[in-house]
Each structure stands twice: as C-alpha cells, then as structure tokens.
A protein has these predicted regions:
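Sec-dependent signal peptide recognition
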Residues: 2-8
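C-terminal motif of bacterial Sec signal peptides marking the signal peptidase cleavage site
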Residues: 12-14
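N-terminal hydrophobic targeting signals that begin at the initiator methionine
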Residues: 1-2, 16
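Compact, glycine-rich, soluble single-domain proteins
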Residues: 16-141
Length: 141
C-alpha cells in the first residue's frame, strides 16, 4: 500500500496547475495565468465561458518572434496585447470567436502576449509604448 501512495504522489507532482499572479501594465493590475510551455500556450483560454474584469492569460515565449494566434474553441471575445522582451507594448488587436477561421499575427519582436477581456486595453487607455511589469516569480521563466 505504501508503494502505491508514493507512486501516486510522484505522479501528481508532475501535474502542475498554471502559475497565477498579478502583473501591471502602466500601473493597471491584471490577474493572470502564466503560460510558458507550448502546451499551455496552445490551450490558451479555450473553452472559458467568461473572464473576470481584470483576469487574463500571459504567454511567455523562449525568444522574441512573430506569434500567430487563432480563436479555435475560444468562446469569449478577447483583447490581445503584444509586448517585446523589455515589456513595451508593441500593438493590440481584438479577436472575436470564429471557430479558428482567422489567424492573427503579432509584430516580429513579440516576447509576451497578454490575452484579456475585450476592450481591456481601451478601457484603461493603454496604447503602444505602455510598460508591462512582472512579479519576480514570473521573471524566472
């Protein structure tokens, strides 16, 4: 019996839930899940019925690159902000649920992608040049 408990604990230790934390864009707080693995980024916000007012997902990539996103199995409209490695907002786009028909492309130097509720960037007046600030626990990734 003890063997099975040890095995179960070992297997469960590999099942990590997403890291959560508060980030800021120009001192505006957002409570986000962190997506750093290809699997986490691919899952994104699929199947979510809603997000709270300042809740979202922050994707982090291994290196600056052009990122392509789609809305496959995403049920809610989103605002997406593309940031470079220094945390500067490069561009935003609005994405509507469409079953994954349209591809959205980021600027080539994208390192972070922030997915939030539709109109989040406009509501807070966040434009290109706004600054992303991460907690220390997120900077390890």
């Amino acid at each position: 019996m003890k063997k099975y408990i040890v095995l179960l604990l070992f297997l469960l230790s590999g099942c990590s839930s997403p890291q959560l934390g508060t980030i800021q864009v120009n001192n505006i707080n957002a409570y986000v899940e962190l997506a750093v693995t290809p699997e986490q980024r691919e899952q994104g916000l699929m199947y979510r019925q809603q997000l709270e007012k300042d809740q979202g997902l922050l994707m982090v990539f291994e290196k600056p690159q052009q990122v392509s996103l789609w809305m496959l199995n995403t049920l809610i409209p989103l605002d997406v902000g593309y940031f470079n490695k220094q945390g500067e907002l490069l561009a935003t786009t609005q994405m509507l649920p469409d079953g994954g028909k349209q591809l959205y492309h980021s600027p080539p130097e994208t390192f972070y992608v922030l997915e939030m509720n539709r109109d989040w960037f406009n509501r807070y007046g966040l434009k290109p040049g706004a600054q992303l600030t991460l907690p220390e626990s997120f900077k390890r990734h």
